[in-house]
Amino acid sequence: MIQNKLLKMKNITILHTANEFIAKGDYEGFLAYCTAETKWFFVGERILHGKEEVRAYMKEFYQEPPVFNVEKSIEEGDFVMVTGEIRLRNKEGKYDHFDYCDIWRFEDGKMAELKAFVIEKRGSPPPSSE
């Protein structure tokens, strides 16, 4: 039933709907929107193969649901690109802040591949030269 519904939705809508599950801490709900063989490439860091590795990643890094601030979303064919900011609570209970650019590839209405560029924000921004 969910598959028929997904095929009628735009990929950008599917992604934002899936991310609502992440925001609520329902990671299994999110994973229902991914293909079984989903691949996540975190540029310069790691590659996750399949839902089991993604599930383990979420268990390790999402101590509580991450907080997203989506800046832009662009859909082109089977791809959706999203930029924004994300906050993750670390094991010490403090938030780590990141900028991100995610490029998602869809197959049959499900998220099949992610290429993520994630950059940690450190310290204060440099003072203005004006």
Labelled PLM ranges:
Residues E37, R46-A56:
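Short beta-edge strand/loop motif at the mouth of beta-sheet-based domains
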Residues K24-F41:
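Short, well-ordered alpha-helical segments enriched in acidic and aromatic residues
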Residues I22-G25, R46:
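Conserved short acidic donor-positioning loop in nucleotide-sugar-dependent glycosyltransferases
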Residues I2-K10, I14-T17, A23-K24, F41, ...:
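A beta-strand edge to alpha-helix "cap/lid" segment located at domain peripheries
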